[in-house]
């Protein structure tokens, strides 16, 4: 229901703008939520939405982002599955299939058809929570690429589980021992539990490239070669 509410707000700029307007009293914004969503949604959902719109938001887009985050967190809390890993695997499937990425990212495509396609691809291969999150997000990209949507969802899920996400790019898969050592090192460095997601990219040649949020640690051979070429050219 939270995903549905976010979609409805995204489709109605006048409504989302009014709900994000800090000049309007919080009680007024809360009443709008009750009037619009109260008749069709569960009291718990309406309560979460009411609380959300009473906060200060810089824009309607930020409000919708906030409601989407609530939806992802709610799906995560309700599931015992490894939603984070399942979303990551789906993001790699999208990255490896340009036609799929184009179909899901097309502005001309029908939103519900995109959701149905994702549900069809994931049902039986992933948990209900993952199907819900992925199929819901692709229906309202709001100028974001599919992989951006999934990456953000992965970070939210990891945060809800008390972890940070490290995306490791390597020329070959890490052994269990290497992954364990890297996880331990990163956990100590960042002071939090780390979840590793590995991307295989032969172009890095050797070494690793690690990204945690906006922080990038590039220890790849390709990066060192690029630095060397730049120095030689200079």
Question: How should these model regions be labeled?
Answer:
Residues 1-211, 215-234:
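Elongated, mostly alpha-helical coiled-coil "stalk/stator" tethers of large membrane protein machines
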